[in-house]
Amino acid sequence: MAMTLLEDWCRGMDVNSQRALLVWGIPVNCDETEIEETLQAAMPQVSYRVLGRMFWREENAKAALLELTGAVDYSLIPREMPGKGGLWKVVFKPPTSDAVFLERLHLFLAREGWTVQDVARVLGFQNPAPAPGPEMPAEMLNYILDNVIQPLVESIWYKKLTLFSGKDIPGPGEETFDSWLEHSNEIIEEWQVSDIEKRRRLMESLRGPAADVIRILKTNNAAITTAECLKALEQVFGSVESSRDAQVRFLNTYQNPGEKLSSYVIRLEPLLQKVVDKGVIDKDNVNQARLEQVIAGANHSGALRRQLWLAGAEEGPAPNLFQLLVQIREEEAKKEEEEAEAALLQLGLEGHF
């Protein structure tokens, strides 16, 4: 009955029923001032305005319709409140999960002094985002979830880069530049945010001379990209290695004892790419060079090495990195399975005797 009255009253006043409260059970002799004082005492943290009051004949009491005027935490709205003549009842439509989410988002941003538009601007979006509200259409809600909320979550919870200072004597736990750069590239690739945000996160990880380099670059070019920043850091702090030295290191990198061949191939790849970058190996010959070094550097004998040798001897193109790893891992899995079966057979024979 109370819910029906709430909906009908809201419909008659063109008010969103999910943004309204019905307070009833108010004594007939309770004046406007007493009603307002009771409401404020029961809901001090809820923003509202009284739209009207009426006498509810069936309950022989007054009822008041309130409109919620700001972001609301529905957990702060009581179902009953102490007032003149006893407990006053409070009725409101349970909000949908989307509405609750948007209200909480709005509250969070309001406490921080931000709006959804501010978040979108900081994250680098060109089109202004619409302000959230419980009555928001589905397509607008999807826009905010995809273009504002997801980046907001990404900007709060993300994998951070380790620190790098570029000092001659690295700080405790600080990596060498080459190691830091390799790990940083992997992490930056995972970030699903704008390049402006990527650059900001990169700056968070820099200290000392490394941070000074990027600040100078930004002064000369405010639109410098994250990739350009990393390239500049590599030019300043990267190891100085001649093309000949890079080639020698690549050709003298062998599979370690106990190391899987697939792991060796992955370890070899950065060295190969460095040789290519220095122009020692043409990009069109990368796959062939990789295959030849894997054959030369592998300490495995047997079927797998023969297969690789045959692949290199064929007239067709050498397998690329992905194809090579698939082939190697299939053979490794087959070998592990054969070794496991042999071990079980050996155990069975020992038990028999």
UniProtKB/Swiss-Prot annotation:
Claim: Thylakoid is one of the keywords in the record: no
Expression sites by tissue: Predominantly expressed in testis. Very low levels in the brain, including in the piriform cortex, hippocampus and some subcortical nuclei.
GO cellular component: cytoplasm; nucleolus
Keyword field contains Nucleus: yes
Record-linked Pfam families: PNMA (PF14893), PNMA_N (PF20846)
UniProt keywords, alphabetically: Nucleus
Coiled-coil features, chain-numbered ranges: none
A GO biological process held by the record: inflammatory response to antigenic stimulus
Compartment(s) of residence: Nucleus, Nucleolus
Family membership noted in the UniProt record: Belongs to the PNMA family.
Entry protein name: Paraneoplastic antigen Ma1 homolog
